[in-house]
Amino acid sequence: MSRIPFIYCILSAFLSAACSFRAPEEHDDASVDIIPGLEIPEFADNEDIVAHLGYTASYNHRTLVPDWVAWELTAEEANGQLNDQYPFSRDPSVNFPKASREDYSNTGWDKGHMAPRADMKWSSQALEESYYFTNVCPQDHEMNSQAWEQIERLSRLAARHYGSVYIVCGPVFTEGRYGTIGRAQVHVPDMFYKALLTHTGKGYQTVGFIMKNQPECSQPVNYAVSVDSIEALIGRNLFPQLPDEQAEATYEMKYWTK
């Protein structure tokens, strides 16, 4: 899968500039080199990459959902206190075709955040942009409000504990069993994945999760897999800049259940 050197450099520059808005974390390990855009997965030259203040996404104009959404969550951001409510809306920075609120109306599917609003409560702009449909997929309500949300909480706890966590998640299409919704024909995913990366002070640690788009209410450990397993499923390198490839091959839940 080819990369876009020029776009990737611009994206890294954007992310580096965005970091200037974030205060240094007391958890930071001075021995760890900061790698701008470490959360950004490998992407192809035909992907529509959108960089917002709190997350970066690849929007798919065929499925009308993001292929992936990636963000770094710091300890300070995980403690954000803003609680403004915004309507879901079309992302003005992407071209048509794109999903709208009407496509989800009366379908029985949640407008499921990929980068959760609770991770964006450190900035009004980041919070508002989390409601763009470039960050939304149709999700089963029980899964979205229970098992998926538990993994979101786990991510915030890890960010507070280690200082920051790099996160990438997105939909998985296998059988297409749920078809499409709305006039625009938004594709409903069969599953979702989420991959987490952090530095513990002693080395990089990762964990992945794969969850079916159906009622799910179990504990995160029951959905845990290696990042390599997710990459094999979706055919994408999730952390191409990670210096330690071995960290993707295994996972230990003890690093994620503090």
Regions found by a protein language model. Give the residues of each.
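Bacterial N-terminal signal peptides that target proteins for export
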Residues: 1-7
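Bacterial N-terminal signal peptides
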Residues: 8-16
